[in-house]
Amino acid sequence: MDKAAEQSLRAGQIIRRLRDFVARGETERRIESLKKLLEEASALALVGAKDRGVRVTYAFDPTLDQVLADKVQVQQVVLNLVRNAIEAMEQSLRRDLMIGTERGEDGMAVVKISDTGRGIAPELAGQLFQPFVTTKSHGLGVGLSISRTIIESHGGRILVEPNPSGGTIFRFTLRAVSPEELQDAH
């Protein structure tokens, strides 16, 4: 029991430090290719997924590619969401994972990661981004809390909703860079 309490305290300290770090604005935000960022992060997260019967599809909006982001931080969010999706589909007969982008409101890019896993109980969905809340039998329940901190530090939002075809959809937003801004940057 003492060990579990100790681990919880340690995880809480890690989350607090990350929030402080992000709150101080210590991020390396640059203009990045969203498609490339997503492909690189998902390639790492998808190692072994094919062997588990996961079918992956990509659906990128061709008119939307450049975002203002700290590449490493956002890739950590993608890595976390994709790994969670793969784990959620372990018991599913259909294991479809979709990673895509679409244009959102107010100059935001929307990243969408959907799975056909077991889904999330409605009573848990509202708490999912709180530290130590998890749907897994293992793990600390800090990944989504950290992901929310990262996305909010980028001026975005992260949301969860049921997938109409079964499973879960996570969406997060990042500021898209307009062609005019891109021109001015060069």
Model-derived features with residue positions:
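Conserved DHp (HisKA) dimerization/phosphotransfer helix of two-component histidine kinases, i.e.
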Residues: 1-24, 30-48
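Short beta-strand-loop-beta element adjacent to the nucleotide/active-site pocket used for signaling
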Residues: 95-98, 102-111
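Short helix N-cap motif at coil->helix boundaries in the Bergerat
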Residues: 119-127
